[in-house]
Amino acid sequence: MLGFIIIFFAKIVEVSLTTIRIVLITRGEKFYGSIIGFFEVLIWLYIIGTMLVGINEAPLKMITYASGFACGNYIGCILEEKLALGLITINAIVSVKDGYTLAELLRKENVGVTIVNAKGLKEEKKMLILHVKRKRKCELIKLISDSHINAVISLMDTKTIYGGYGIRK
């Protein structure tokens, strides 16, 4: 019974680490991704060694392994959201008047804002471009929403930013 529990929880840890490692590597953090990969493989080797011993007599080990894998994916995604690693670009399209108001509001929160002229269907617009850490995403979207400014907001993952204001790695 203890073997099943170890397989289940070790697989959760291993797959969660895999999720974090992949996110780190795709965001350019090769060093940290490699370190996590080292521990990930150690855990995997332990799990496989534990699992393969007596698998014919205890085929439920496969179900335990698969369950740990599924739970690990779910928990890994939750961890990745909580860690909010990396950067995002937020584009907010607003009226000309609201563009300057919103830019000032964001700058008071120590956010670098670039204002670009844009053309809507019926009128001129302003597009505000913000490059921020993902950890600030919810805070800034709430700030824009709470300002009661009618904005069209889009978010994009950003791999690398050179220069700019207010962003430190």
Question: What label would you give each PLM region?
Answer:
Residues M1-E81:
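Membrane-targeting alpha-helical segments
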Residues M1-L2, E123-K125, K169:
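Generic structural signal for short, solvent-exposed loop/turn connectors between secondary structure elements
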Residues R21, R27, R107, R134-R136, ...:
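Arginine residue identity/basic-tract feature
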Residues Y32, I36-G49, M62, Y74, ...:
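Short amphipathic alpha-helical patches
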Residues T64, G68, V116, K159:
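Short glycine- and Lys/Arg-enriched binding-loop motifs that mark or flank ligand-binding interfaces
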Residues C71-K133, E139, D146, A151-V152:
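Canonical alpha-helical transmembrane segment with a positive-inside/aromatic-interface signature
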Residues K137-K169:
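A membrane-cytosol interface segment of integral membrane proteins
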